[in-house]
C-alpha cells in the first residue's frame, strides 16, 4: 500500500470514528424539555484562540502582519503579493466556529464596503458637472442643501435664559463699539485682505429683508457677488458669447456701497474668467470646446455655456486657492515664515489611529451665528472710514450718520439701491467712466488697487468701529436677537473653549469690562453679538496668529473655512483636471517654489498684464503693506527677489511686420538696441560677482562685439564643417536606434523630444564641456532630458519671457538651474585650465564622441585669451550654450513639421531621394529644403528698444517710434512677406539665401548660423532617408500649437498643462530598418 493510499485510508477511518462518536453522544442525551416543540436547544460553541492557532502557519501570520501594517500606516497594498487572496485562504482555513475567523471575515467585508462611497458623492452627466446658478445640486442627493433662498442653519442650541429686555442696540454701540482713536493693525495687514473678506462674507450671507431666516445667496464659495445668486442675476452678467462675462462688471449691487477696492478685486476676477475662457477655447482640449456656427443656435448655446461654466469652475478654484494660500496663511501669520504649510481642507485623508477621516462633498448650509462672526468693521482703515463718511453724506445730506434713526437709515439705503440700474454695465462705480468696449481704464483700476495695498487696515477689538457704522451695527444686533441665538459663552462651549467667568476675561480693559457688567449683569448673559467683537484681540504670533482677531472669532473662522471648502463637491471630489481641463487645473495651482505657495499674483497679473512687473511685491503679497513686507522678506532673505517699485504702465510693444523694416531695424545698432542684457546679468551673477554684461547679446557696446568675435573664432576652427556634419549624422542615428520602437510592427519615435532636442544637447555638452550623463560618460550629472530642460528654461528666460503671469516662476527657476550648471561647468573648465589638453580628460568626459577633442580645444582657445575661467563660463560659455540648444531644436522640428503636413508632404519623396544620394549637390538642395521649411513654420520674434526717435516704414505705413519704446521685429510675418518671398506659402529652392529671416540680421545675427545650417540639414538628411516617413496617427503625430500675438506660435507641453515656447512632442512613423551607426 502506497504512502498516499495509507494516508487516505487513515483519513477515512478518522472520519468514520468521528461520526460514530457523534452517534454515541446523541444516544446518551436526555429527552428535550426546554422547548415546547420537542426540539433541543443548541448552543454554538466558539473555538478558543489556541484551537484557531493550530490552523495558522507562518505564512498566515505574515498575512496578518501585512494587513495590520497597511491598516495602521495607510500604505497601499501591493496586490502582486496576493494579500487579498491570502486573507481569503486564512479565513477559509479557520474552523467555522472560529471567532478570529469571523472577525477577519467581517473586517474583510468592511474593507470592501468602505472601498466605495455610500451613497456616491460624484456623478456623471451635464446636470452634475457644473455649478447651478443658485448653488443647488452641490450634494446631488440633497440638492437643496446650501441653495440660495433656503433658511440659515443654527449651530448652537440656545439654553441660557435671557432677559426679554436686553440693552438698547444703539446704547451698546456707544458703550462698547464706537471708535475712540484709530489703531493700526499690529501685523500691518492691508485693506486688500479685508476686501477679500468682504467678498467672502457677501458670497455666503445675504439676509432676506422680508424673511430674515432666509439667505438669498448660496452657502458655498462660488463667487456669487460676481456671478449672481440665481439664474436671473447670472444671465444679466453674461454676454452669451464665447463663455464671457460682460467686461468689468459684477452681479451684486451691495458692493457698490463699499470702498471701491472691493469692486476692483471683483473686476479682477471678472477679467480672470474672461482670460480663462479665451484660453480654453483656443486650446480646445480633446475637442471639448469646438466652436460651431453661430447660426446653429442650440449648438452655439451649448458651446457658450460649456465655456462659461468651466470658466466659472476655474475662477472659483483660483478664488479658493487665494483664500487658502494667501488669506488663511496671512491670518495664521505663516507668511512671516519660510514654511509652505497651509490649512488646506482639500487634503486627502484616510482613516487612521486618531479616528475616521473627515467626510467631504457633503454640502454645506451656513449658520446664522457665522453671519455675525464676520462683521469686522473695527478693521476699517482711516482712508476707508473717510470714504464711507463721504458716501453717507451723499445718501443723507446735512445729517450726522451716527445720529440717523434706524428707520431713516433703512429708507435711505432703500432709495439708494432702487436708483441703481438692473443692467450691471450701467451702474456707477467709483466715479469711473467706461470705454467704448465697456471696460474701465486700467490706470484707474490699478491706482485703486495699488493704494489699497499700501493702506494699512485697523485693529480688531472693542471701541474701534467707526461711528459712521452706528446704524449698521445696531441693525446687526437687532437681527441677531431676531434669530434667537445662543449666548457668547454657549457659542464658546460649542467649540470646546472655556466659558468666561468674569467680564474681565472677556475684555481686560477696565472700562469695557465695567460697561459689560452694567449692561449684562453676568458673563453668561452676554449676547453672541456684539460679544464676539468686544472680546480682547489675540496678540501676534508667527506662525499662529496673524489676523489678531478676537479670541472666539479666531477659532470659529477656521472651522467655518474647513466646512465651506471640504463640504463643497466642486472644491473637492470634482476639483480635477477632467472637470477643469489640464491647462486650467495647472494654471491655478500653487507652486512650492513661488511665494511659499501664495497665488494672488496669478489674479493680479492676468487682470493687469501691462502695469505690474512679474516680480512686483504689489502682485505677489498684496495682503500686507509693502513696507512691512520689506521687513518680512528681508528677514527671510528673499527681499531681493522682488521689485518694490509701484506699478507703472508699460505699453505693449509695437510689432514691425515687413521684411524690409525688420532687416533695417536689426541692422541699425545705433537706433535700436538689444534688450537682453539685464536678464543675462541676472542669471549669470555668481557669488555676488557680476557676469554676463560683456556677452555678445547683452548690449551694443564694444565689449559685446569683442565677445562675438572671440566666440566665433573658438567655434569655427579648421574643418569645423566636416566635424559638425559627422557628429550630427552620428548622434541622430544613435538617438533613432536608442529611442525608436515598434508598435504592432510599425516603427515609431518622438522626433521632437527624443531626436531634435537631444541631438542639440549632445552637441553643446561636447563643445562646451557640460556635465551630461550618458552611457559613455556615466559620471555626468544631468541626463539628456534634464539638460535640455535647463537649456530651454535659460533660453526662455532670456529671449521669450513674454507671459507676465509665468515670468517670476520662470526667472527664478532659470537662475537656480543656471547657477547649478555653471558651477559644474566651471569645474570642467578649471580642470582644462590647470592641465591643458589631456587625453585622459577627453576619454573620461566624452568617450567615443567625435566632437570631444573639438570641445576641449575650443575651451583651451578661450583660455588662451587670458580671460579668467569664471568669466569664460559665466559671461560667454553658458549664455552661448543657452542660446543654441532650444533654438536649433525648434528650427529643425518646425521645418520637419511642415514637410509632414498635408501641403508639405508632396516634397518628401524628393527629400528622401536626395538624402540617399550623399553628394554635395544633393546636400545643398537639402539645405534649401530645410531653410524653406523653417521659413514657413518659423516662430521667431526679436525685441529691440528705440534709442532715439525715428520713423519706420512698415508695409506702406509710416510708424513714428519714440525713445524708450519697445518694438518686436516679427520674423514670422517677415518670413512670409510676399515682396521678399513671392508665393510665400510655396517651397522654392532658388530663393536668395541671404534673405532668410529666422536667424536674424545684422550685428546680432545668430552666431551659430553656419553651424546651425550644417547641423540641421544633416539631421534632415538622416530623417529624410527613412522610407514612407509620416506622422503617427491622431494628435500624437502633430505639434500642439496655437497662434499667439503677431501670429507667433505658442506650443504646449505633451500633457497640455502649460504653454511652451518650443515644440515638445511629435511622433513619426516610417517603413524599413534603420541604417547601422558608423563609429
UniProtKB/Swiss-Prot annotation:
Task: List every stretch annotated Linoleate 8R-lipoxygenase.
Answer: 105-446
Q: Report if keyword Nucleotide-binding is assigned.
A: no
Q: Name one GO molecular function term.
A: iron ion binding
GO annotation (BP), single: biosynthetic process
Q: Which Gene3D superfamilies match?
A: Cytochrome P450 (1.10.630.10), Haem peroxidase domain superfamily, animal type (1.10.640.10)
Reactions performed catalytically: (9Z,12Z)-octadecadienoate + O2 = (8R,9Z,12Z)-8-hydroperoxyoctadeca-9,12-dienoate; (8R,9Z,12Z)-8-hydroperoxyoctadeca-9,12-dienoate = (5S,8R,9Z,12Z)-5,8-dihydroxyoctadeca-9,12-dienoate
Enzyme Commission designation: 1.13.11.60, 5.4.4.5
Annotated residues for binding of heme b: 202, 377
Q: For this UniProt record, give its keywords in alphabetical order, as a comma-separated list.
A: Dioxygenase, Heme, Iron, Isomerase, Metal-binding, Multifunctional enzyme, Oxidoreductase, Peroxidase, Virulence
UniProt xrefs under Pfam families: An_peroxidase, p450
- Cofactor(s) listed in the protein's UniProt record: heme b
Respond yes or no to whether keyword DNA-binding is given for this record.
no
Show the segment(s) annotated as 9,12-octadecadienoate 8-hydroperoxide 8R-isomerase.
Answer: 654-1079
Q: Which PROSITE patterns is this protein grouped with? A: CYTOCHROME_P450, PEROXIDASE_3
According to its UniProt record, which residues of this chain constitute the active site? Answer: 374
The free-text function statement in the UniProt record for this protein reads: Bifunctional heme-containing enzyme that oxidizes linoleic acid to (8R,9Z,12Z)-8-hydroperoxyoctadeca-9,12-dienoate (within the N-terminal heme peroxidase domain), which is subsequently isomerized to (5S,8R,9Z,12Z)-5,8-dihydroxyoctadeca-9,12-dienoate (within the C-terminal P450 heme thiolate domain). Oxidized unsaturated fatty acids, so-called oxylipins, derived from endogenous fatty acids, influence the development of the asexual conidiophores and sexual cleistothecia and regulate the secondary metabolism.
Tell me the subunit arrangement.
Answer: Homotetramer.
Task: Please report which protein family the annotation says this sequence is part of.
Answer: Belongs to the peroxidase family.
Q: Name the PANTHER family on file.
A: PROSTAGLANDIN G/H SYNTHASE (PTHR11903), PSI-PRODUCING OXYGENASE A (PTHR11903:SF37)
Q: What is this protein called?
A: Psi-producing oxygenase A
What organism is this sequence from? Aspergillus fumigatus (strain CBS 144.89 / FGSC A1163 / CEA10)
Read off the lineage from the record.
Answer: Eukaryota, Fungi, Dikarya, Ascomycota, Pezizomycotina
The gene name on file is ppoA
